[in-house]
Amino acid sequence: PNPEAAETLALAIKLADKKNADLILATDPDCDRLGIGVRQKGKIKLLTGNEVGILLTDYLLSEKKRLGKLPSKPFIIKTIVTTDLIYEIAKDYNAKVYDVLTGFKFIGEKLGVIEKQNELDNFILAFEESYGYMAGAYVRDKDGVVAAMLVAEMAQHYLCQQKTLIDRLEEIYECYGYNANLLKSIEFKGMQGIKEMNEKIEAIRNNSPAALGKYEIKQFKDYQKGIEGLPSSNVFADHASVPALANDSSLVSPRTR
């Protein structure tokens, strides 16, 4: 079961309604990714990976500061296709944000480099928009167990203030600016699908559009060229005048059936 898919949580939502539960926590079978649902105005609302990552970043930084446990040089790690709102939150805590390529192996690699610099104690959180989170360097991969514990703790923290996680998310948006996240998955089947996908990506790469709908493309980043100190990867990003849009072939996975 994929915790990103709403239909996966249908039974959990039904049980939550029966028990009037405030929170749903759901992992995939190997318990590395976490999906959550929050009761808001009587109904369960599912949160995206970006929304949960925003909440965790805000909660961990603010609580560590309140308790006097925020390290001197805190840092967050995220992937290049994950929300940039993290930068705005991090500024308030003098925290650094590292961007890496899509996939937790790159997050693990970055932690390894930082560990050699004796800076690992400054690590706060790593996450990607595809529902993977890691807090603490105990496991160098996305960890649904630790994420579930933190989300439950965070939810209880705000419920004690008569707030839901969605209420807190709205407060964050009011403070740092509203963000909308839309993920569109396109399935390409088999070897022919791989070929078709690569052809479409190359067509856009070789003839990048000047606009996306009514929005002018201000910047086109081609990560295949190994930009921003990152390894070469078949990813490009269109930075438009209003939205920021990312295209990642690893998020459009061919499935052989």
Residue ranges and their predicted role:
Residues 1-33:
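N-terminal small/polar loop signature for handling phosphorylated ligands or for N-terminal nucleophile
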Residues 28-30, 37, 130:
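Anionic group-transfer/hydrolysis microenvironments
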Residues 32-51, 86:
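Short Gly/Thr/Asp-enriched flexible loops that form oxyanion-binding sites at enzyme active sites
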Residues 17, 21-23, 43, 63-257:
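Phosphate-binding and adjacent anionic-ligand microenvironments
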Residues 48-61:
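Catalytic or ion-translocation cores adjacent to nucleophile or general acid/base/metal-coordination motifs
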Residues 33, 53-55, 104-108:
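Short gly/pro/ser/thr-enriched loop/turn and capping motifs at secondary-structure boundaries
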Residues 7-11, 56, 106:
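Well-ordered alpha-helical segments embedded in enzymatic catalytic cores
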